[in-house]
Amino acid sequence: MKKMDMSPTIRWNPFSPGYFTDPYPHLKACREATPVQQSSTDSFFLFGYKEVDEVIRNRNFEVVDMCDYLIQKEPYIFSGQPAGCPFLGRVTKFWPLYLNGDLHKRVRRAVTLAVTRLGTPEAMTDALERTLSAFRDKTAFDLTDCCGYFNFIFLRSMLGFREDFEFTAVKRLSSLLTTMLDFYVPKQAYLAAEEAMQLSRPFFGESEFARIVREDMHDLALSDDECYSIMLVALFASFENSTANFAMSLREILPDRALTEYVLAADADRRKVLVEELLRFNCTTQYTIRYNDVPIELGGIEVPARSRLQLCLASANRDPLVFDRPDEILPERQHNPHLSFGAGIHLCLGGATARREMASVLAPMVDFLKDCDIGPARFERKILLHIPEYIPVRRRPA
């Protein structure tokens, strides 16, 4: 095995010009020039599908422990100080995306059970009808708000949070929680997330979702805060991913007359194939992280044990060695092993919900918006997630 060249011809830089609007040209350059990059002694970025897929499916590789990570990263604000983030530091121990072993399996099973029982087709239909009613008379609006409102209504039905917990508050809470998980997070972001979690706590009481989770994990005797923490994960995992995937898919479909007509004419099976292609193309979760338990070789590079492997799912999804014409949306793409929701035992919790939502409501939403013009999108300055902040929509005059 050879050692990593510490001077790659193209070095990953999320602050390169245009990255937050469209990261794919830069990711392509990284993948083609240096598909495995070492950023520090024990940290590597992986851009090629082969390497990303190999790592993400290895059941022996672990995710980062969120509690330990936060304490190590910001010891003062997570040390229990009154001016710090004691609540955030305490409850993240039940966030399944940062758990390993049996506890990960238990939390994941409980959440999946609750989502399966409560995220019904009837709840989706009701959310769609309420959304169309709320936006029908608007001549101009934000597409991300339209898609977010649909998810807000659906999640309120599923999670059972109070009716007076407003859409803007849910959107802000979800955004703060995902900001906290990003690269290069300032202390102010953690403090804002702590405050938002505390303020939102009264809106999440006992619900059918909480009852199912408690019942499935009865031997752990979850506290109210721990149950609330699990509900928060279900909230932001579903809200951020589903809203972004939905909005970005509509952004691609509506200006394309052929694609619009394809969606409206497609049967259920063809729509499912298209949904997978849209998920591959958009890839809202751009990165995930693993730690290898033993030394490994990736792309001919020696990687020491317990290295931080930062897997670029977005780059892997555009790898031409796996996907024909990867930078295009091919509605009937048959070979599509995309990694948008990860893979293996840490498959994204919000993935199943996003798939069902897209398959169920994509066509009626396209029909609702087919006479609208879509303006240039503005994207959030996040690295872990590639999500739109604002997509202007204006109805054409009759």
Positions of predicted regions on the chain:
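Cytochrome P450 catalytic-core helices
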Residues: 230-235, 239-263, 351-369
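Conserved cytochrome P450 K-helix E-x-x-R motif and the immediately C-terminal K′/meander segment
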Residues: 205, 218, 265-301
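Active-site substrate-recognition loop segments, prototypically the cytochrome P450 B′-helix/B-C loop
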Residues: 1-147, 152-167, 175-183
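Cytochrome P450 catalytic core segment centered on helix I
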Residues: 159, 169-225
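Cytochrome P450 proximal C-terminal region
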Residues: 27, 355-398
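Conserved cytochrome P450 K-helix/beta-meander segment immediately N-terminal to the heme-binding cysteine loop
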Residues: 314-336, 375
